[in-house]
Design a protein with these regions (language model features):
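Thiol/disulfide oxidoreductase modules built on the thioredoxin-like
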Residues: 127-130, 138-185
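N-terminal targeting signals for export/organelle localization
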Residues: 1-56
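Active-site acidic short loop of glycosyltransferases
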Residues: 72-75, 105, 131, 153
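A short beta-strand-turn-helix
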Residues: 56-77
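C-type cytochrome heme c attachment motif
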Residues: 84-91, 157
């Protein structure tokens, strides 16, 4: 290598390193932005679905019969939309089960609305039995959740109703124990 090619080689090396650093910074910035977006609670927006209609709804129960939403009216109610094919939904169900068992005597209610096929829900509940009420909505549950503020139509999606039926909280994404405690204290 002659002396005249050394500066060119050094310049290429510096450009390569500079490009790598810029790419790393851009990637880190994008990852940070995405993590903040995922942590953000569902934006507040008016609910287009008529909550009065909610109390008239009935859903098939996994073991047969109907889950009448009217039977849950008048107490704080957490409605959780989930599906057996949704990993975050499945991960949060044991937390919801624990929370339900700790709080059912305190008039706190939970209902799970499975946006799934009835047979898939029945099979799933044999492996992970739940004691809080479950209704099966098929895929129409996703449209229902959208009318209550689930802009993306993603699962899991949870809505917390006060005893008088007004919406207190909403979240698209997996609930945490902190979420549940905050929501419970708000009612």
């Amino acid at each position: 290598m002659n002396d005249s090619s050394k500066p060119l080689t050094q310049r290429r090396h510096l450009l390569t390193v500079g490009a790598a650093v810029a790419a790393a910074l851009a990637g880190a910035g994008a990852a940070y932005w995405q993590s903040k977006q995922e942590q953000a609670e569902t934006p507040r927006m008016p609910i287009t679905g008529d909550l009065d209609e909610l109390w008239q709804m009935q859903f098939d129960k996994p073991d047969g019969g109907k889950l009448a939403m009217q039977s849950l009216k008048g107490k704080p109610l957490l409605i959780n939309f989930w599906a057996t094919w949704c990993p975050p939904c499945v991960e949060e169900l044991p937390l919801l089960e624990r929370f339900y068992n700790q709080n059912k005597a305190k008039s706190m209610q939970i209902v799970g609305l499975a946006a799934d096929k009835p047979e898939a829900v029945r099979t799933f509940l044999k492996k992970l039995p739940l004691t809080f009420p479950i209704g099966i909505t098929d895929l129409s549950g996703i449209a229902l959740s959208k009318s209550w503020g689930n802009l993306a139509g993603g699962l899991p999606f949870s809505v917390m109703l006060a005893a008088d039926g007004h919406v207190m909280q909403r979240k698209m994404g997996k609930l945490s124990e902190d979420d549940l405690n905050i929501w419970q204290n708000a009612v």
